[in-house]
Amino acid sequence: MGVVMKYSLKLIIVVFIAVVIAACSSKPAEEYKAEAKKEVELKNYSKAVKIYDELADVHSGSKDASEALLEIAKLYHSKLVDSLDEKTSYKKAFSYYEKIYLEYQNSAEAPNALFMAAFLQGNELNNPEEAKKLYKLFIEKYPDSEMVNSAKMELENVGLTPEEILKKNTPQPKK
């Protein structure tokens, strides 16, 4: 029993030291942000995504992490990341928006992320049923948001062509 206890104690000490070293060696979030912004300015979008992703991993659960995830989503949504076709870029953007509203529900970025996820589903990924579900969730979760009226309007028009929306919203002449 004594040998097992000594071994267990040594293992606990080694793990503790490793955790402390890892925690101390991580860069501050501001340093990651500055590096990522520099890469965006240089139009090195893939590199910026990697830096923001690392920030989100290292500072997981923080405000900085949710902000970094939103920046990644916006880069993919804007189709700025090289070597991706449009649909793949939109799907990547959606996955980051989704991660924000699922894992960072109380963050300042969550309402915008949920709205944009719905918008992408309805307007870019041609999935009106998923868009409706997400717009309804947005309206339910964020009834006081300044974007709630936009969500309601999108919900009414999702899946319609521009011509159908115009026809629906234009008074028809009396016969």
Language-model regions: role of each:
Residues G2-L11, V20-K175:
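Acidic, polar-rich low-complexity tracts and alpha-helical solenoid repeat scaffolds
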